Amino acid sequence: MNQDTICAIATAQGGAIGSIRVSGPEAITITGRIFTPAKSGKLLSEQKPYTLTFGRIYNGEEMIDEVLVSLFRAPHSYTGEDSTEITCHGSSYILQQVMQLLIKNGCRMAQPGEYTQRAFLNGKMDLSQAEAVADLIASSSAATHRLALSQMRGGFSKELTTLREKLLNFTSMIELELDFSEEDVEFADRSALRRLADEIEEVIARLANSFSVGNVIKNGVPVAIIGETNAGKSTLLNVLLNEDKAIVSDIHGTTRDVIEDTVNIGGITFRFIDTAGIRETSDTIESLGIERTFQKLDQAEIVLWMIDSADAISQLTLLSDKILPRCEHKQLILVFNKVELINETQKNELASQFSEHIGSEIESIFISAKQRLHTDELQQRLVAAAHLPTVTQNDVIVTNVRHYEALTRALDAIHRVQEGLDANISGDFLSQDIRECIFHLSDIAGEVTNDMVLQNIFAHFCIGK
């Protein structure tokens, strides 16, 4: 393990307060070289751990700032190493001066994610918990925050530990039987092993299946805004995002490519996708945009079909022939836009005609994106259509693609064990599949993960974490 002492700014620029983290075998010594306690007369190394000490940072005779230094001794720190945290004023000049002094006295600049990587390598957390730290930092909704917190606190890790213990018990019984194969003694009751395999399979399957919900919670519910040209799709996107993300124009075919962005509505992250308007065109670029429109439609969980209320009937054929067949397993909401251009009688007639033509079970709403009429109600409809479960900090839901892939491979291995037990195959073949299952579960926790995978994971962290 690298024994360098590292330092990094842990706070964003522009705040009133700044924080610098120092970790490694010389963290306390190096910090003590530039820090002078204000009152106690004790050196920093003589201070009690888990305390704050007020004092000053000096560059020779020149005072840089008045600061607070917190002291942590190994192994009782975030990284498991001796650590200090210097809290100073948030001036970028002050922060850079302190960093230069630390580096001059023996620190080196930390790499992205190096603090959390050291915590993992020092056994302070497993790899799934380390990844949860990054998820917690990136959390943008109550649900993503709760899931990241649950995983960081070890909820997922406990499930994995329990599974591995059961699998190790399983394989030990099988291998004990192999050791005494010449004695014709059966140590492992096959029916009991089948019940244990079923129990393990049920837990792994539950965790793997939870990814469909976890992925949506983490990355946002994909909502495709679809419709003919000039139906008001880009205007609606700007209203939902509360910013001018998309260009709005009366010219048909203005949007030629997909525009995506996320926003939190009612505690749920939605990923809105504005698409090119659907129409017959000879323009090659616009045609490619329309192809992408249908690709995004297929990927969406919720589809908003935007309709120009003043020209709605002409869209019935397109809706029936091309849109409805693709939305069989999706939440489709018909959004009649530009409602200010029609009267109440016309509005009722439109609702009746569409209901008669495509069925009354499809949800619809009349809005004016330009005038922001009933857009709040549309947001409420989106929250209801998301159908996401209420998430608590005790829930174990998989949100990480790497974890999902490992669980899928573990599930395949345990399925082979079940099939092998049913076929009464030799214990040595069963043992191979059990060990493969253990391997994939251990990979999630980082017990068998190679260095390249670790570097890729921690490279996505910020410098100060």
UniProtKB/Swiss-Prot annotation:
Its main location: cytoplasm. Homodimer. Heterotetramer of two MnmE and two MnmG subunits. Its cofactor is K(+). InterPro entries: G_TrmE, GTP-bd, GTP-bd_TrmE_N, GTPase_MnmE, MnmE_dom2, MnmE_helical, P-loop_NTPase, Small_GTP-bd. Pfam families: MMR_HSR1 (PF01926), MnmE_helical (PF12631), TrmE_N (PF10396). Coiled coil: none annotated. Binds 1 potassium ion per subunit. Exhibits a very high intrinsic GTPase hydrolysis rate. Involved in the addition of a carboxymethylaminomethyl (cmnm) group at the wobble position (U34) of certain tRNAs, forming tRNA-cmnm(5)s(2)U34. Residues 220-387 form the TrmE-type G domain. One of its GO terms (cellular component) is cytosol. This is tRNA modification GTPase MnmE. GO terms for molecular function: GTP binding; GTPase activity; metal ion binding. NCBIfam families: mnmE_trmE_thdF, small_GTP. It is found in: Cytoplasm. It is an enzyme of class 3 (hydrolase). GO terms for biological process: tRNA methylation; tRNA wobble uridine modification. Belongs to the TRAFAC class TrmE-Era-EngA-EngB-Septin-like GTPase superfamily. TrmE GTPase family. It comes from Bacteroides fragilis (strain ATCC 25285 / DSM 2151 / CCUG 4856 / JCM 11019 / LMG 10263 / NCTC 9343 / Onslow / VPI 2553 / EN-2). (6S)-5-formyl-5,6,7,8-tetrahydrofolate binds at R21, E85, K124, K465. Its EC number is 3.6.-.-. K(+) binds at N230, S249, I251, T254. PANTHER family: TRNA MODIFICATION GTPASE GTPBP3, TRNA MODIFICATION GTPASE GTPBP3, MITOCHONDRIAL.
